């Protein structure tokens, strides 16, 4: 009796703790956030593991993502269905990877997916152009964009193939002291 939570079984909570950087309290807080996004869709009882997809259009309205120029790409990177719709597991994964406790390697893996717009497992000049357009709100002149993209490829392309593989990207991220402090969101 009493106020014991019944949103998840103890086993489910233990599994979430094992697979994320969160404790039980954080997981319950995340469920509350997920529920707030779509109260008519998200159940309060997850003990039977319902599969509910919250549409990307609702996810990107969260304060943590609303102003981010990569909000759709972030949500798509964590979406199992590839359309940006998130299950609770996807939602927890997104917050776990973007939390301050997640290691640089894990963050780099997802950052690479986010910046790989054409999903060819490389960051090519076109991907860099799209990244710059989002970061600068398309305020750079075309010749400036070309110059910046060429310089990034020149500096970061370790194997000289004209594009950045994950190893190139990871090396570049390792040299960016502010990557960890900027690639995160709080619950």
UniProtKB/Swiss-Prot annotation:
CDD domains linked: EFh (cd00051)
Record GO biological process: calcium ion homeostasis; cellular response to ATP; photoreceptor cell maintenance; positive regulation of cytosolic calcium ion concentration
One Pfam entry name: EF-hand_7
Highest taxon above the source species: Eukaryota
Keyword entries, A-Z: Calcium, Cell membrane, Cell projection, Cytoplasm, Magnesium, Membrane, Metal-binding, Repeat
Keyword Phosphoprotein: no
Consequence the record notes for mutating residue 186 to W: Causes deafness; decreases interaction with TMC1 and TMC2; abolishes localization of TMC1 to stereocilia; reduces localization of TMC2 to stereocilia; reduces calcium permeability and conductance of MET channels in hair cells
PROSITE patterns the record matches: EF_HAND_1 (PS00018), EF_HAND_2 (PS50222)
Domain EF-hand: 66-101, 103-138, 144-179
GO MF entries: calcium ion binding; integrin binding; magnesium ion binding; protein homodimerization activity; protein-containing complex binding
Effect noted on mutating residue 140 to R: Disrupts interaction with TMC1
Residues that coordinate or bind Ca(2+) 2: 157, 159, 161, 163, 168
Location of the protein in the cell: Cytoplasm; Cell projection, Stereocilium; Photoreceptor inner segment; Cell projection, Cilium, Photoreceptor outer segment
Effect annotated for changing residue 152 to F: Disrupts interaction with TMC1. Disrupts mechanoelectrical transduction (MET) in hair cells
Coiled coil: none
Primary location class: cytoplasm
Changes seen on gene knockout: Causes profound hearing loss, whereas balance and retinal functions appear normal. Impaired stereocilia development in hair cells. Abolished mechanoelectrical transduction (MET) currents in auditory hair cells; while unchanged in vestibular hair cells. Hair bundle morphological abnormalities begin after birth, with regression of the stereocilia and rapid hair-cell death. At P6-P7, the rounded horseshoe-shape bundles at the base of the cochlea lack their typical V-shape.
Expression tissues: Expressed in inner and outer segments of photoreceptor cells, as well as in the pigmented epithelium. Also observed in the inner and outer plexiform layers and in the ganglion cell layer (at protein level). Expressed in sensory hair cell stereocilia, with expression mainly at the basal body of the kinocilium and in the hair bundle stereocilia; and the apical surface of hair cells (at protein level). Located in the tip region of the stereocilia and at the apical surface of hair cells around the cuticular plate (at protein level). Not expressed in the hair bundles of the vestibular hair cells.
Positions that bind Ca(2+) 1: 116, 118, 120, 127
Subunit note: Monomer. Homodimer. Interacts with WHRN and MYO7A. Interacts with ITGA2B (via C-terminus cytoplasmic tail region); this interaction is stabilized/increased in a calcium and magnesium-dependent manner. Interacts with ITGA7 (via C-terminus cytoplasmic tail region); this interaction is stabilized/increased in a calcium and magnesium-dependent manner. Interacts with TMC1. Interacts with TMC2. Interacts with PIEZO1.
Functional description taken from the UniProt entry: Calcium- and integrin-binding protein that plays a role in intracellular calcium homeostasis. Acts as an auxiliary subunit of the sensory mechanoelectrical transduction (MET) channel in hair cells. Essential for mechanoelectrical transduction (MET) currents in auditory hair cells and thereby required for hearing. Regulates the function of hair cell mechanotransduction by controlling the distribution of transmembrane channel-like proteins TMC1 and TMC2, and by regulating the function of the MET channels in hair cells.
Cross-referenced PANTHER family: CALCIUM AND INTEGRIN BINDING FAMILY MEMBER 2, CALCIUM AND INTEGRIN-BINDING FAMILY MEMBER 2
Protein name, per record: Calcium and integrin-binding family member 2
Record organism: Mus musculus (Mouse)
């Amino acid at each position: 009796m009493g106020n014991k939570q019944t949103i998840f079984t103890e086993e489910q909570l233990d599994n979430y703790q094992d697979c994320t950087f969160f404790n039980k309290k954080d997981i319950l807080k995340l469920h509350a956030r997920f529920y707030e996004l779509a109260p008519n869709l998200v159940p309060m009882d997850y003990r039977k593991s319902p599969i509910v997809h919250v549409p990307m259009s609702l996810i990107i309205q969260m304060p943590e993502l609303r102003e981010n120029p990569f909000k759709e790409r972030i949500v798509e990177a964590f979406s199992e269905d590839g359309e940006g719709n998130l299950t609770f597991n996807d939602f927890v994964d997104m917050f776990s990877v973007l939390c301050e406790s997640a290691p640089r390697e894990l963050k780099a893996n997802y950052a690479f997916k986010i910046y790989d717009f054409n999903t060819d497992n490389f960051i090519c000049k076109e991907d860099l152009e799209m990244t710059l357009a989002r970061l600068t709100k398309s305020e750079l002149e075309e010749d400036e964009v070309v110059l910046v993209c060429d310089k990034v490829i020149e500096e970061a392309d370790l194997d000289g193939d004209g594009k950045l593989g994950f190893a190139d990207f990871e090396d570049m991220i390792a040299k960016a002291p502010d990557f960890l402090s900027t690639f995160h969101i709080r619950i």
